[in-house]
Amino acid sequence: MSFSVDVLANIAIELQRGIGHQDRFQRLITTLRQVLECDASALLRYDSRQFIPLAIDGLAKDVLGRRFALEGHPRLEAIARAGDVVRFPADSELPDPYDGLIPGQESLKVHACVGLPLFAGQNLIGALTLDGMQPDQFDVFSDEELRLIAALAAGALSNALLIEQLESQNMMPGDATPFEAVKQTQMIGLSPGMTQLKKEIEIVAASDLNVLISGETGTGKELVAKAIHEASPRAVNPLVYLNCAALPESVAESELFGHVKGAFTGAISNRSGKFEMADNGTLFLDEIGELSLALQAKLLRVLQYGDIQRVGDDRSLRVDVRVLAATNRDLREEVLAGRFRADLFHRLSVFPLSVPPLRERGDDVILLAGYFCEQCRLRLGLSRVVLSAGARNLLQHYSFPGNVRELEHAIHRAVVLSRATRSGDEVILEAQHFAFPEVTLPPPEAAAVPVVKQNLREATEAFQRETIRQALAQNHHNWAACARMLETDVANLHRLAKRLGLKD
């Protein structure tokens, strides 16, 4: 088989139709899956010895949240090293990163796999992966044809990365010195709320404004602070963290501003405070609403004049520090109640950011679950950690009052429980592995009244075909076991499968 000019033109056109990079990438992947007739396809970006999914088709949604470290995925490492088309034999001993992640085929191993590394010049920037359930699925395509596909995808990805870099530079102040690239914190989520938050982070990071980050406990406010710092001109300098809620009143001032020897009992030497440590960098004050009014006044002075005084010292020290503050309180209410200074609130909230709670982020919960599943897989040395359909349904309908932190702990606990109930190094997370309070789940989709588009015979055959497929998937394509599950004779099952087009 060879690609026609029309096929290649269609791929190129799809790359131009999208409004944004994400839309273009999704169109590319969807078109490729149709053209190559594969069961699953993915476009991955390469960054710091890991592949990050940008768009997928035919794979479970949680794949978008996973981060595939090369040391944990030998097939992806082989693709990264190859420099050309990589075809993995059906009996390859290297585990496929997508085993168990093709919906409806969770219990089956991927058979056919092709990897296409994507380059910009001599630099690896990403990869295309194509997977199929049949061992010879991609034999009809030559390496040269697959290289054409890779070239189109590489061009699209390279242009997107270049535009992203230029847009980031254009947001920098005109007199800012270009800074060395720093590994960026990954903020996982494609919901409207997270997309807007990422845009706001990109805008404010390039400035030197103080930022107030608000959000419920466990939403990831510290991660937002890291993302702001890493995308700022101060990225090569320190990001210093201080949890104001954990500060005893007796040492709070010393922690912030430092002290000199003999300033108080126990001050046996001079000590720098967090502001000095963060000089020319960023200071992140977590739970700032917990600071006393007296300390708020001293913090305000630093923000106004840029100088500090160590405890026990009359001299002032100049510091150049950007302050990022976070709170899970409504500071406006705290101001009205007299527990927080209005002038400090206005100094801090020049550019306020609000981190949405997990219950308002829709399918982001599945992406984050995928991320934590992959983390657990690497930490525990497992071959795979997969979410069942029931587990995904449960996660999507639980409110998560503890937000992302609660989800992380729930995934880790579920992996440990699942691992204890089955042998081997493969873990499938079921709904019963999650100890959530009662969750009201919607009725199964099958309970909905379908729109009739077939006659009775066609509908019956479609139902039989899907039932046999699911039974085969659950029994690793063992026809005898499948027949036992369906309570039918194996010979009759073979004849029915042939009539339904499931067997040659």
UniProtKB/Swiss-Prot annotation:
- List the HAMAP family: NorR (MF_01314)
Q: Which PANTHER family match?
A: ANAEROBIC NITRIC OXIDE REDUCTASE TRANSCRIPTION REGULATOR NORR (PTHR32071:SF35), TRANSCRIPTIONAL REGULATORY PROTEIN (PTHR32071)
Q: Boundaries of each Sigma-54 factor interaction domain copy?
A: 187-416
Q: Which GO terms describe its biological process?
A: phosphorelay signal transduction system
Which pathway does it serve? Nitrogen metabolism; nitric oxide reduction
Q: Which GO terms describe its molecular function?
A: ATP binding; ATP hydrolysis activity; DNA binding; DNA-binding transcription factor activity
DNA-binding region extent: 479-498
Q: What is this protein called?
A: Anaerobic nitric oxide reductase transcription regulator NorR
Q: Which InterPro entries match?
A: AAA+_ATPase, GAF, GAF-like_dom_sf, Homeodomain-like_sf, NorR, P-loop_NTPase, Sigma_54_int, Sigma_54_int_dom_ATP-bd_1
Species per Swiss-Prot/TrEMBL record:
Escherichia coli O139:H28 (strain E24377A / ETEC)
Q: Could you say which residues bind ATP here?
A: 215-222, 278-287
Give the function comment from the record: Required for the expression of anaerobic nitric oxide (NO) reductase, acts as a transcriptional activator for at least the norVW operon. Activation also requires sigma-54.
The gene designation is norR
